[in-house]
C-alpha cells in the first residue's frame, strides 16, 4: 500500500451501498467500517477511492451473503480533483473484495478503476483492465 498523490474526497459514509465489481459472487456491499479513520465525535466514518473498508455482503450467492469482509473502493460518484487540476467522477460507487493483506479475492475486475486506487494497491492494478 502506498500513499496518495491527490486529495480524494471521502464521500462514502458507513451505511453506503456499493456495487461489487469483481467475480467473487457478491453483488451489493454495505460499508460498516473504514480502516484508519480518525474523526470527530458523532461524525460518521467515511471512505473514498482507494480506502480500505470493511463491508457486509447484502446481495449475492448464499455462501457470500451476511459475511463481513475487507474491500477497496475503486470508483465513486462524487467528483474529486487531481493535482493537474482535472476533476474525476464515475457513474457508480464500486468496490472489490480483498484478503486482509490487500490482494483481490476475485480473478477479474469489471469496469474502470480509479488511478488513485490502482497506484495505492498493486494487486488491484494487476487485475484492472481499464485504469481511468
Curated annotation (Swiss-Prot):
GO annotation, biological process: translation
Keyword field contains Manganese: no
SUPFAM superfamilies linked: Ribosomal protein L14
Key words of the record: Ribonucleoprotein, Ribosomal protein, RNA-binding, rRNA-binding
Listed CDD domains: Ribosomal_uL14
GO function terms (MF aspect): large ribosomal subunit rRNA binding; structural constituent of ribosome
Pfam families with a match to the protein in the record: Ribosomal_L14 (PF00238)
GO annotation, cellular component aspect: cytosolic large ribosomal subunit
Keyword rRNA-binding included in the entry's annotation: yes
PROSITE patterns reported in the protein's UniProt record: RIBOSOMAL_L14
Function: Binds to 23S rRNA. Forms part of two intersubunit bridges in the 70S ribosome.
UniProt-listed PANTHER family: 50S/60S RIBOSOMAL PROTEIN L14/L23 (PTHR11761), LARGE RIBOSOMAL SUBUNIT PROTEIN UL14 (PTHR11761:SF8)
UniProt record similarity statement: Belongs to the universal ribosomal protein uL14 family.
Subunit field text: Part of the 50S ribosomal subunit. Forms a cluster with proteins L3 and L24e, part of which may contact the 16S rRNA in 2 intersubunit bridges.
Name of the protein in question: Large ribosomal subunit protein uL14
Organism the protein comes from: Methanococcus aeolicus (strain ATCC BAA-1280 / DSM 17508 / OCM 812 / Nankai-3)
